[in-house]
Amino acid sequence: PPRMPCKMERYFFYLLYLLLGCSLCGCSRKQAPKQTQDPDTETTIPYADTIAAPVPPAPAKSRTARYLDSLGFVNIAEADSSIAIDLMYTRADNFTGTLLYEDLKEAYLHPDAMKSLKRAQRLLKEQYPGYSLIVYDAARPLSVQQKMWDVVKGTSKYIYVSNPSRGGGLHNYGLAVDISILDDKGLPLPMGTPVDHLGREAHITEEAVLVAQGKLTEQERENRLLLRQVMKEAGFHPLPSEWWHFNRVSRQTAKERYRVIP
C-alpha cells in the first residue's frame, strides 16, 4: 500500500504551499497593469473659477496731489466719482498756450467747496439724471498762478487773471471751480464760447444783448442759466466775466478765514 506522509513531511509541504502562495500574490500585485488616463480626457481644476484676477494698482498720485492731501484738501474724483474731470491746464490748448500743470493731474477743492459741489451735482441730476458736471479747473497753487500772470501781464488779458502778488484769486484757496455740463451722451452742452474764452461773449451780464446780436443762441443762454441755477442753489457765486467760473466765498472772506495754497 502507498506510504502515508509523516507528520514532518506534511508540515514541510504546508510551509512550501504558504511560501508559494505569498510569492504568487506579490508578483500579481507588482505585475498588475498600472491604470493610466489619457491626458486628453483628464479632468482639470478650474483655476479661473477659484483664483481672482489680479487687481491693477491705482495710478500713483502726483507730488502736488500728495501735498494737497496733507493740507486737508479734497480730491474731487474720490469724493464724487460721478463728476467728470478734465483739467484744461494739463494741456497747452488753453488761453496761455502753455502747459501750466506740469505735475498736478488731479482736481482738488477745499472741503467747504467740495460739499457744495456735490450738492450741485445732485441738484443737476434731479432735473436731468443723465447729465453731469465737468470740472476744468479747481484748486490752483499760487506758483501756477504766477506762471499764468507772467503770460498775461502787459496785455489786455491781464484783467482776467488775479495778480499773485496781491494774494491771488479764489482758485488759490481751493474755493473756486471752472465748470460746465455734460449731456447724457457725455458731450459738453453748448455754452456759446469754449471754457477759457477771454472776451465779451463769455460775460454773463450781456447774454440778452448777445442773443439779440446773434452771438449767442437762446439754447446756449438756457444752458448757462441751468449751470448757474444748480451752482447758485448749492452755494456758489458766478463770476460776471466768465460763465464757467464760480466762487464759494468772497475774496475778503477767503483771506480772513482760509489759507492760500503756496
Task: Describe the residue ranges of each PLM region.
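Positively charged n-region of N-terminal signal peptides that target proteins for export
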Residues: 5-13
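Extracytoplasmic cell-surface/polysaccharide-interacting catalytic and binding patches
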Residues: 28-138, 148-151, 155-241, 250-262
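Short, well-ordered surface patches within globular domains
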Residues: 144
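Conserved metal-phosphate-binding beta-hairpin within the catalytic cores
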Residues: 246
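Sec-dependent N-terminal signal peptides
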Residues: 14-21
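Segments that shape or occlude catalytic/ligand-binding pockets
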Residues: 141
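C-terminal motif of bacterial Sec signal peptides marking the signal peptidase cleavage site
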Residues: 23-26
